Amino acid sequence: MAVGKEIRSKIKSVQSTQKITRAMQMVATSKMRKTQERMRSARPYAEKIREVMAHVAETNPDFKHPALERRDVVKRVGVILVTTDKGLCGGLNANALRTFYQYAERWAEQGIEVDVCCFGQKGYAALTRLDMKVVSSATQLGDTPQQEKLLGPASHIVRAYLDGEIDELHIVYSKFLNTMKQEPRVEQLLPLKTEELESEFPYSWDYLYEPDVRGVLDVLVRRYLESVVYQAVSENMASEQSARMVAMKAATDNAAQAIERLKLTYNKARQAAITTELSEICAGAAAV
């Protein structure tokens, strides 16, 4: 029964794969809870600093700051692209990259150049294959994002904006909606869209600034950008673990179905072989 041996070998192979995918599912489930807790704990700070930025922008409409001023002509944009270091997380990276490519094509049609700061090995590898301009990057971020590892690459492209080398700064990442759903998001970081902030927080406060409004805004903008980048990376990590858990569960279920089909095929082949042997025995006995 050469066919039977081949089927048994396939069954063992699929069972081994199923053990791996089940283990990866369990690990992803554990990590998913931790990343979601980290993401949710970071949200209040990010929301509060956005609120403060809205109030400061509204109470100082005549103050000129690079983070608030729109450039007359946009010749170059910067993009912070957040992806994962590892695969096996469904279409998470593919969707984020597809969204980035759509924006990049739109900018290219307008003659706008694109500089990219990339977080995550998957995005970095994809962009280098396409010879896109990656001005800074950070990979192997681990399961817990460290501010020190994020600030270096991000500060490089932020400084380029403040120095006038780029005219807009955007961030692309995977927004965590729930365990089953994550979607790519594109947000403009600089210049700040004050009208959106003001509509989000319609009331205002009056502030007294020490020593002056520019000094406060310089620090506030830096903290704002740090919180946005950290929040985006945290959201992306929560999305990664959720997508990986779902993908590994689907792989485990598919493996179980494949094993059942192979067992059925094996039993049919074995039954056919036994029937053939019995027929040959009966035919031999009749001939005698």
Swiss-Prot record:
Pfam families reported for this sequence: ATP-synt
Source superkingdom: Bacteria
Compartment list: Cell inner membrane
GO biological process terms, semicolon-separated: proton motive force-driven plasma membrane ATP synthesis
GO MF, one example: ATP binding
A single Gene Ontology CC term: plasma membrane
Signal peptide residues on this chain, from the entry's feature table: none
Keywords (A to Z) from UniProt: ATP synthesis, Cell inner membrane, Cell membrane, CF(1), Hydrogen ion transport, Ion transport, Membrane, Transport
Entry keyword annotation includes Repressor: no
InterPro entries cross-referenced by the UniProt entry: ATP_synth_F1_ATPase_gsu, ATP_synth_F1_gsu, ATP_synth_F1_gsu_CS
Membrane topology: Peripheral membrane protein
UniProt family annotation: Belongs to the ATPase gamma chain family.
Physiological role: Produces ATP from ADP in the presence of a proton gradient across the membrane. The gamma chain is believed to be important in regulating ATPase activity and the flow of protons through the CF(0) complex.
Quaternary data: F-type ATPases have 2 components, CF(1) - the catalytic core - and CF(0) - the membrane proton channel. CF(1) has five subunits: alpha(3), beta(3), gamma(1), delta(1), epsilon(1). CF(0) has three main subunits: a, b and c.
HAMAP family per UniProt: ATP_synth_gamma_bact (MF_00815)
Protein name: ATP synthase gamma chain
Species this protein is from: Laribacter hongkongensis (strain HLHK9)
Record gene name: atpG
